[in-house]
Amino acid sequence: MPASPSTARAINDRLALRLLQQEGPLTAGQLKQLTGLSRPTVADLVERLGAAGLIAVVGEAGERRRGPNAKVYGIVADRAHLAAVDVRTEGVAVAVADLVGRVLAEASVPIAGDAGTGPALEQAVTLVERVAKEAGAERLHTVGIGAPGLVDPSSGELRDSTGLPEWHRRLVATLQERLPDARVSVENETNLAALAEQRDGVAQDRDTFVLLWLGHGTGAAVVLDGALRRGASGGTGEIGFLPVPGTAAPPTSTDCEGGFHSLAASAAVVELAAEHGVSAEASEAGVVRAAVDVVRGAVARVGRQEAESLDGPAPAVAFLDALADRLAIGVASVVAILDPGCVVLGGEVGQAGGAELAARVQDRIGRMTPLPTEVRATTLGGGAVLRGALLTARDRAQEELFEPGGVGRPDGGQGPSSPPPGRSVGLSRP
């Protein structure tokens, strides 16, 4: 049955808006060419979207630069403002962007481990408000949060699985209270990093891959056939709890010590480096920075030491080999179950190891499994979480603003169809 005129208009409007998001400003002629719509239909939708305040003339094209065909249309970027929040054990990072995802301001603050719940929440919320003010955003339409822990698929609430600070779990509710007009949602940090790698990073050519997060702790995100897979309880990818050989005791339901976490988290990486005579300079920047320093330093020295060493592997070489041995245990487990074809070493430590560490892990996987698997190093590093949170917030805002009934409404489309506060959106569900 053919679509009704109103449905056809809505479909055409969304198609045009998506093209303007993906391609940037376009003329009516370019919209006609890209959409395949007739000239009158394009003229109608341009007028309709302009009246709704979603697009505007942003310039002219062509040598003569005059006439209706020369007008270039773009999304009204300040129609809505978005915030992305990256919550870590040691602090918070915030970025505020416009509707097309252009970052206008960003900042981060450390939060001490012994800070009370109230003071920690106040620091985090105040940072969001300050960055929004610096960005010139009078109000935030959408706030996307990335945090460690499990996100319940039914409620969208963050659940602790590894003894995280109480303020992590209370941040969504506190932000929603301080920003009552905003749509606030939370997603597991590693899932957001995978989204960023799929959209903007090294996995753009992959519909199926696994991201292995190597930062303060460990985690994994699973993307199969283009969709993120969360599992029945939202816990897909809790690889830190994977039992592994060589630890004093297996992990428990409340503590991942003794699991893969004990082999590949930043503290374990620093200890492994010290065992091989590779050490980082003393720093107050934290264990993640120390792990990044030892891995990056080893990568920088490995070529020279391989050439100079006559009596067995040099320290940097031995350290990277030992680290690759450890990472291969986790990667091989994922490969045996999922056969993803590609594993991305993500996070700050994955980026520090780069192609050198990725090649070592891939070599080991090639000897451990018959399933062909490419191992790649992230190019986004620790910034992937914030980027993924921003992409999720942008998707959610555009979903509301671009939908029929949401177009041009002063509340930005808030209504019965809007997801409830705290519900994670923006990534495909199984």
Residue ranges and their predicted role:
Residues M1-A61, R65-R139, G246-T252, C256-P430:
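ATP-binding/phosphotransfer module of carbohydrate and carboxylate kinases, centering on a glycine-rich
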Residues V72-G74, L82-D86, L140-G144, F209-W213, ...:
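Short glycine-aspartate micro-motif
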Residues A147, L214-H216, G347-E348:
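Short secondary-structure boundary segments
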Residues R206-A264:
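Glycine-rich phosphate-binding loop of actin/hexokinase-like ATP-binding domains
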Residues D98, P153, V223:
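Short, acidic, Ser/Thr-enriched surface-loop or helix-capping motifs
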